[in-house]
């Protein structure tokens, strides 16, 4: 991202630390399947979720501390999703063993 974009992002938070935490949390949400607020043409340019999270914040469509997904709900959803993935892998392994 350009330096002017970083400066804009820093103005949204009270510290560089908070900006990095918010960006990391949003990148994790995106990784776990949370929908992006960016138009499709902007999402296609990068597969880097940290950059995508920073772009989302820079557009103003996400506001720090207000409309990011609730952290507890996000964690519960992530755990359920991961458990389902592991169960599917286990079932596939059991199926292969039967063959």
Curated annotation (Swiss-Prot):
Catalytic activity: RNA(n) + a ribonucleoside 5'-triphosphate = RNA(n+1) + diphosphate
InterPro entries the UniProt entry points to: DNA-dir_RNA_pol_omega (IPR003716), Pol_omega/Rpo6/RPB6 (IPR006110), RPB6/omega-like_sf (IPR036161)
Keywords carried by this UniProt record: DNA-directed RNA polymerase, Nucleotidyltransferase, Transcription, Transferase
Top enzyme category: transferase
Gene Ontology CC, one term: cytosolic DNA-directed RNA polymerase complex
Tree of life domain: Bacteria
Any one GO molecular function term: DNA-directed RNA polymerase activity
Subunit structure: The RNAP catalytic core consists of 2 alpha, 1 beta, 1 beta' and 1 omega subunit. When a sigma factor is associated with the core the holoenzyme is formed, which can initiate transcription.
HAMAP family: RNApol_bact_RpoZ
NCBIfam families noted in UniProt: rpoZ
Function according to Swiss-Prot or TrEMBL: Promotes RNA polymerase assembly. Latches the N- and C-terminal regions of the beta' subunit thereby facilitating its interaction with the beta and alpha subunits.
Assigned protein family: Belongs to the RNA polymerase subunit omega family.
Descriptive protein name: DNA-directed RNA polymerase subunit omega
């Amino acid at each position: 991202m350009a330096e002017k974009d970083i400066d804009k992002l820093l103005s949204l938070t009270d510290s560089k630390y908070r900006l990095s935490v918010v960006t990391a949390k949003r990148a994790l949400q995106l990784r776990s399947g949370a929908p992006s607020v960016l138009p499709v043409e902007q999402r296609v340019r990068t597969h880097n979720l940290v950059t995508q999270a920073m772009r989302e914040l820079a557009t103003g469509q996400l506001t720090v501390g207000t409309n990011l997904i609730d952290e507890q709900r996000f964690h519960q959803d992530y755990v359920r999703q991961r458990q389902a993935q592991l169960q599917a892998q286990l079932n596939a392994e059991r199926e292969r063993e039967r063959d």
